[in-house]
Amino acid sequence: MKKILIILCILILSCNVFSCEFKNGREYTEKHKVISNIPSIIEFFSFFCPYCYEFEKTYDTQYLIEKKIKKNINIQKYHVSFLGGKLGYVLTKSWIIAQQMGIEKKIVLPIFKGIQETYTINNLDDIKKIFKEKAGVSESKFNSFWNSLTIKILISKQEEDIRKYNLKNIPTMLINEKYVIDYSKIEEIFKDSFAEKYTKLIQFLINKKEKI
């Protein structure tokens, strides 16, 4: 009986510490009134965002989420078009095509590098070249995806979601359509053990219940 009480006390204390570790307005922000019933994560980024590039190279957030959080979660990654002018839209559409092909990991860093380091990506043909060199995608296959109705529907939905969430900063993560994580804030707060605290924060928000 004594052992059971000790275990219960430890669990209660650990839960309290965990819940107090993260605060609304500090590590995350409550964005919307209604929480989604389906656990979901949406990452927002741009190939024109230097901070997004550094974050992708250093932490590989997709890997952290998939490997560290043991739960069936709908994970999406949206490229925003409000940076980069016309090329921003072209990159958004190309990113959706890469997702549909399942080749995101092969092209994400080469595109970042081409945009921000070598300055070798300036138009759609340059993007097609990356797809071919890094993922073996022929121009005809790329074009068939580019002109497909599916891609048009997906890009319309994504742009509608971005407008709905009214995001101001990137990179940003939206959890359960309610909680927003601004990477620029948490990197400094979590600097000593970022990956561990970052995944704990995501888990905390995924499991967070609305107060009735």
From Swiss-Prot:
It comes from the Bacteria. This is Thiol:disulfide interchange protein DsbA. Keywords: Disulfide bond, Redox-active center, Signal. GO terms for molecular function: oxidoreductase activity. The keyword 4Fe-4S does not apply. The keyword Signal applies. Residues 1-19 form the signal peptide. Disulfide bonds join C49-C52. It comes from Buchnera aphidicola subsp. Acyrthosiphon pisum (strain APS). CDD domains: DsbA_DsbA. Transmembrane segments: none annotated. It holds the Pfam family DSBA. Belongs to the thioredoxin family. DsbA subfamily. PROSITE patterns: THIOREDOXIN_1. InterPro entries: DSBA-like_thioredoxin_dom, DsbA/DsbL, Thiol_disulfide_DsbA, Thioredoxin-like_sf, Thioredoxin_CS.
